[in-house]
Swiss-Prot record:
GO terms for cellular component: cytosol; nucleolus. CDD domains: DEADc_DDX56 (cd17961), SF2_C_DEAD (cd18787). It catalyses: ATP + H2O = ADP + phosphate + H(+). It comes from Aspergillus oryzae (strain ATCC 42149 / RIB 40). Residues 247-469 form the Helicase C-terminal domain. The gene is dbp9. This is ATP-dependent RNA helicase dbp9.
Length: 605
């Protein structure tokens, strides 16, 4: 395109944003001068062009500069710091092949994210042979095994801060030769209760270490980490306008508390949503209540929460990404419980922070303590869920910030997605006690902040209207199913699931590396069978079906239908069969004849 001439017939300078965009379009991995083995891994994984954060961060990282980058989850932040670290390790090994030391440390807030980062490192180091070794310290292994893993000085260590401090205390891990430090999801590390561990690490890490702070938001916690670890960092505030949720259609439904279950049943039974769905709920109990409710109608789903063993949680995410399961019910516990905050951040909040990011204050009596199990669990941030068609906020989050992170699980990598949220009007709160939650009291005020925040990003949260006349026809079936899902049934389901997953977790750890075929036998969406299942609820009578939905759910060829039930006289037939064998029921007052020619036992006189 020709540029306009000014008064002196000189072409006007090219606009800065256009120039920047042109540079981004021209950028490729070849221009980054990476090691051929890394480029080979990129080609294998079909990485053609670097994302915005990769194009900006990798050249700066290769120059040795500290980096503070803000970019949304799914923008390629992991590769932006893994590739420069691997490049430096390979260069060091090229000059000194016998060099052995831990030179890279990657800190993450959760075990799930640690496993994900470890997989990325393994993928990019696939062609590096024995030149690059990495260890994930969050794996459930004994201290003796972990000490053995660290004794060989792995080049790269991926861990939560707590595990690093533990191994430093036992002298199993040495950071004397550390050259790279990464804190991924930096805004979560302090809020997840790692403040003491971070302060201990700040004293143990040598000076002059190159630091990467990666975060989706720049908060007070990130500023604290910046002061502890960084030396004049380059700050990258990257907002790819093409990737800021533009592909996510956002809808909200105002409904009563029990109608959440009714609408969920209708959505899945009539297949109103095609593809994979993540259902976000408040806590673990809610997780199993929704799962047991869906089981009543023969709808399979799997759960993800902090109570499950780490191997099982990782396996659930992997299988969900492969398309083995279509419905994942996730307990967003950290968001509901309230992250543990430092004294400084508490004072900042009390002074008054942006109303966009703050939820409604929760009564102290209703807050639960965060257990050690929950400390390193998080699902709405960092985890790379693939090809998610819809995010269903069964329970609305308490902040607009959390809402943004939840809906970020869909519409990733240029694809489209949908976010549907259930909102309880204030006058409906507490009217159906069995399904009521404390957080729904503030749904309307939180929704107002969500709409405001999304409006600033140029997105609209639209109301979604169901044809309630048709939906109401299903209410009696929903009521029957919900009545069967009692509090006792939920508790039994939790205990049963944990027992099953513990067994599976051990097998995953010890056995399945040698027998990968048997992985198919492990299903996380099996029925829990703790609630009374009513078989008739699994089928929809034709008179309940909406006119438009009949074709999609029924085929023209009905096939053979027997006049009588196949199992009609099952018990009677079994009884008759056993009676023929001499095992039948003995009726009171009736003596059985004894043939003296067949037995030596004489009957009583």
């Amino acid at each position: 395109m020709k540029r306009k001439l000014d008064a002196n017939d000189v072409p006007s300078p090219e606009a800065a944003d256009k120039k920047e965009k042109k540079e981004e379009d021209d950028a490729d991995f070849e221009s980054l001068n990476l090691d051929p083995r890394l480029r080979q891994a990129l080609i294998k994984e079909k990485f053609t062009k670097p994302t915005l954060v990769q194009a900006k961060a990798i050249p700066l990282a290769l120059e040795g500069k500290d980096i503070l980058a803000r970019a949304k989850t799914g923008s390629g932040k992991t590769a932006a710091y893994v590739l420069p670290i691997l490049q430096t390790i390979l260069q060091k090994k090229a000059t000194d092949p016998s060099f052995k030391a831990t030179t890279g440390l990657i800190l993450v807030p959760t075990r799930e994210l640690a496993e994900q980062v470890q997989n990325v490192v393994t993928t990019f180091a696939a062609f590096c042979g024995k030149d690059v070794r990495s260890v994930n310290l969050t794996q459930k292994v004994s201290d003796a095994v972990q000490r053995t893993m660290l004794a060989d000085y792995p080049d790269l260590v991926v861990s939560t801060p707590a595990r690093v401090v533990t191994n430093l205390g036992s002298s199993a891990l040495s950071l004397e030769n550390l050259t790279h430090l990464v804190i991924d999801e930096a805004d979560l590390v302090l809020s997840y209760g790692y403040e003491e561990d971070i302060n201990a690490l700040a004293k143990a890490i040598p000076r002059g270490v190159q630091t990467f702070l990666m975060s989706a938001t720049l908060t007070d916690e990130v500023d604290t980490l910046k002061g502890l670890f960084c030396r004049s960092p380059v700050t990258l505030k990257l907002e790819d306008k093409d990737d800021q949720g533009a592909g996510v259609s956002q809808f909200v439904v105002r409904c009563a508390e029990d109608e959440k279950f009714l609408l969920t049943y209708v959505i899945f039974k009539l297949q109103l949503i095609k593809g994979k769905v993540i259902i976000f709920v408040d806590d673990v109990d809610r997780c199993y209540r929704v799962k047991l409710f869906l089981e009543q109608f023969g709808i399979k789903s799997c759960v993800l929460n902090s109570e499950l063993p780490i191997n099982s949680r990782i396996h659930v995410v992997q299988e969900f990404n492969k398309g083995v399961y279509d419905i994942l019910i996730a307990a967003d516990e950290q968001e509901v419980i309230g992250a543990r905050k430092s004294k400084k951040s508490k004072e900042t909040e009390e002074a008054g922070s942006s109303d966009e990011d703050e939820g409604e204050p929760e009564d102290k009596s209703k807050r639960r303590k965060v257990s050690g199990k929950e400390k390193d669990y998080g699902i709405s941030r960092g985890i790379d869920f693939q090809n998610v068609a819809c995010v269903l906020n069964f329970d609305l989050p308490s902040t607009s910030k959390s809402y943004t992170h939840r809906i970020g699980r869909t519409g990733r990598a240029g694809k489209t997605g949908m976010a549907l949220s259930f909102v309880i009007p204030k006058d409906q709160h507490g009217k159906h006690r069995p399904t009521s939650t404390a957080t729904s009291k503030h749904d309307e005020s939180v929704l107002a902040k969500i709409v405001k925040r999304q409006g600033k990003l140029g997105h609209e949260v639209k109301p979604y209207h169901f044809e309630m006349k048709q939906v109401e026809a299903f209410r009696y079936r929903m009521t029957d199913a919900l009545r069967a899902v009692t509090r006792l049934a939920v508790q039994e389901a939790r205990a049963r699931e944990i027992r099953q997953e513990l067994i599976k977790s051990e097998k995953l750890k010890r056995h399945f590396e040698e027998n990968p075929e048997e992985l198919r036998q492990l299903r996380h969406d099996d029925e829990l069978r703790s609630a009374r299942v009513q078989p008739h609820l699994k089928h929809i009578p034709e008179y309940l079906m909406p006119a438009k939905g009949k074709k999609g759910l029924s085929s023209g060829d009905v096939g053979f239908v027997s006049f009588r039930k196949q199992n009609e006289n099952r018990i009677r037939k079994a009884r008759e069969k056993n009676r023929g064998k001499g095992n039948g029921r003995k009726f009171a007052g009736v003596k059985k004849k004894v043939d003296p020619l067949k037995t030596f036992n004489r009957g009583r006189k």
